[in-house]
Swiss-Prot record:
One of its GO terms (biological process) is mRNA transport. A motif (Nuclear export signal and binding to XPO1) lies at residues 47-58. The keyword RNA-binding applies. The lineage of its organism: Viruses, Riboviria, Pararnavirae, Artverviricota, Revtraviricetes. Keywords: AIDS, Host cytoplasm, Host nucleus, Host-virus interaction, Methylation, mRNA transport, Phosphoprotein, RNA-binding, Transport. It comes from Human immunodeficiency virus type 1 group M subtype B (isolate WMJ22). Signal peptide: none annotated. This is Protein Rev. Residues 10-21 have a biased composition (Basic residues). Phosphorylated by protein kinase CK2. Presence of, and maybe binding to the N-terminus of the regulatory beta subunit of CK2 is necessary for CK2-mediated Rev's phosphorylation. Asymmetrically arginine dimethylated at one site by host PRMT6. Methylation impairs the RNA-binding activity and export of viral RNA from the nucleus to the cytoplasm. The modification Phosphoserine is found at S66, S73.
Length: 90
């Protein structure tokens, strides 16, 4: 969580500085884990989604029932590219 906004100006400044340093360290550790163990960069890969017109809900079950039954799962009518394989090195 972000630092507490209480205290003197100097105390707030020090807390913000320490918090930013912790966030920087967390990001660098995450990038190291991604590059070392998963073989990909920490930069986000753009996710390619199909157009909304090609999405449909599979409603073979009763759609009028309550709860999670009958909701169906979104299905893509055309083949989508293998997005997950883009970030791997072979």
């Amino acid at each position: 969580p972000p630092p507490n906004p209480e205290g003197t100006r100097q105390a707030r400044r020090n807390r913000r500085r320490r918090w930013r340093e912790r966030q920087r360290q967390i990001r660098s550790i995450g990038a190291w884990i991604l590059s070392t163990y998963l073989g990909r960069s920490a930069e986000p890969v753009p996710l390619q989604l199909p157009p909304l017109e090609r999405l449909t809900l599979d409603c073979e079950e009763d759609c009028g029932t309550s709860g999670t039954q009958g909701v169906g799962s979104p299905q893509v009518l055309v083949e989508s590219p293998a997005v997950l394989e883009q970030g791997t090195k072979e």
